[in-house]
């Protein structure tokens, strides 16, 4: 294990950015999101949760797929180049890292998404443990330990020092690249770190949503959950704004669109939301026609369909962003609690 003083982190960021792109939490206009590092960036590692998840690094909100060029009567198709430059995402929390694993199951399964696969190949994740989990957090419900994030490099901020462990080959390579800025940790440091982990877990145990029950949400009771009358009242406050889907670290739905460049056409994909009335709109009109159906689909996918098809892995990581951002205060916690209270299938 290594360590580096907090006041030396700027030098660490500079060293990393000399050879590859570096993305980390940066405050802009009062909001913190993952941005490319620059020497004058207002880095905010102490922020527990960015407004949006850092999934943009691997699954951008918008990306070009290919261009069709027109030259008289001739057309040529030019595929967009795949990601080739290495990059580091620094400061990811355990919940967001689990979110990437959910995306992996989708985009790295056959047929493999080459754009996503290239970014995963060239990306290195540096995790940071959650020093003070917030009341909206419920990652523990999904078996996530925010005190022990699993990534290429795991870090903890303790008493003004960043502790650094690198369990993967990518992590080892990054460690060697910045080794001159790191110092070896000793036994006292190891004790401090274990004390920090214990303190973090103690906070998690006291969070208001830490005891949510997922009983019956693993796909075994699909029909009962789907047909439950609970949905008929639960969905009504939903505004169909899609905020929950855009801040969520596991949502992977996208649309594909074309736009005229004046010299041809660019085809690109962009995030979409299952909460929108035109989501999956097709000529034969089989998209879900009511807000109730769309609302039910979102949470059935998170809690039933996805785990049923992915060895019990849920498509929610308990980050709490939907809890904080929904303007109608309607979120996955309320859904789970509603079924706990009313039995769901009664």
Short names for language-model regions:
Residues 235-245:
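Extended amphipathic alpha-helical segments enriched in small hydrophobics
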Residues 213-236, 254-346:
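Ferredoxin-type iron-sulfur electron-transfer modules in oxidoreductases and energy-metabolism complexes
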Residues 1-221:
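Iron-sulfur-associated redox domains of electron-transfer enzymes in respiratory
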């Amino acid at each position: 294990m290594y360590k580096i003083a907090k006041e030396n982190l700027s030098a660490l960021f500079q060293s990393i950015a000399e050879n590859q792109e570096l993305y980390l939490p940066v405050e802009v206009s009062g909001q913190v999101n993952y941005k490319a590092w620059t020497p004058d960036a207002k880095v905010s590692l102490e922020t527990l949760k960015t407004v949006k998840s850092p999934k943009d690094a691997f699954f951008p909100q918008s990306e070009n797929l290919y261009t069709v060029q027109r030259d008289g009567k001739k057309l040529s198709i030019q595929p967009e180049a795949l990601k080739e430059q290495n990059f580091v995402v620094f400061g990811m929390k355990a919940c967001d890292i689990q979110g990437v694993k959910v995306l992996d199951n989708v985009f790295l399964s056959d047929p493999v998404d080459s754009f996503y696969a290239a970014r995963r190949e060239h990306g290195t994740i540096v995790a940071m443990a959650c020093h003070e989990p917030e009341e909206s957090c419920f990652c523990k419900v999904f078996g996530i330990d925010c005190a022990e994030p699993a990534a290429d490099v795991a870090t903890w901020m303790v008493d003004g020092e960043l502790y650094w462990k690198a369990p993967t080959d990518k992590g080892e390579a990054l460690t060697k690249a910045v080794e001159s800025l790191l110092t070896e940790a000793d036994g006292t440091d190891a004790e401090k770190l274990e004390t920090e982990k214990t303190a973090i877990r103690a906070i998690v145990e006291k969070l208001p949503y830490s005891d949510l029950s997922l009983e019956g949400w693993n796909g075994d009771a699909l029909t009962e959950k789907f047909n439950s009358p609970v949905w008929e009242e639960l969905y009504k406050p939903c505004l169909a704004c899609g905020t929950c889907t855009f801040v969520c670290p596991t949502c992977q739905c996208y649309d594909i669109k074309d736009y005229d460049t004046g010299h041809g056409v660019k085809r690109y994909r962009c995030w979409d939301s299952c909460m929108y009335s035109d989501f999956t709109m097709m000529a034969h009109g089989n998209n879900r026609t009511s807000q109730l159906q769309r609302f039910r689909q979102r949470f059935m996918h998170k809690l039933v369909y996805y785990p049923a098809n992915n060895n019990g892995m849920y498509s929610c990581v308990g980050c709490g962003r939907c809890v904080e951002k929904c303007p109608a205060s309607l979120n996955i916690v309320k859904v789970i609690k509603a079924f706990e209270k009313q039995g769901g299938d009664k």
